[in-house]
Amino acid sequence: VQHPPKIQVYSRHPAZBGKPBFLBCYVSGFHPXZIZIBLLKB
């Protein structure tokens, strides 16, 4: 049975209007060990 990877995306700091922030993305539960991940703005 194959399961999709687990993906978690969250900001490093609480959001503030007009201020930039960084997003952290953690992906686990996939094989092979090296994959390419693209973040797209929706």
Curated annotation (Swiss-Prot):
A Pfam family matched in the record: C1-set
Assigned keywords, A-Z: Immunity, Immunoglobulin domain, MHC I, Secreted
GO cellular component: extracellular region; MHC class I protein complex
Domain Ig-like C1-type: 5-42
Record localization: Secreted
Regions annotated as coiled coil: none
Ribonucleoprotein in keyword set: no
GO BP, sorted A to Z: antigen processing and presentation of peptide antigen via MHC class I
Gene3D superfamilies: Immunoglobulins
Primary role: Component of the class I major histocompatibility complex (MHC). Involved in the presentation of peptide antigens to the immune system.
Record's subunit section: Heterodimer of an alpha chain and a beta chain. Beta-2-microglobulin is the beta-chain of major histocompatibility complex class I molecules.
Protein name: Beta-2-microglobulin
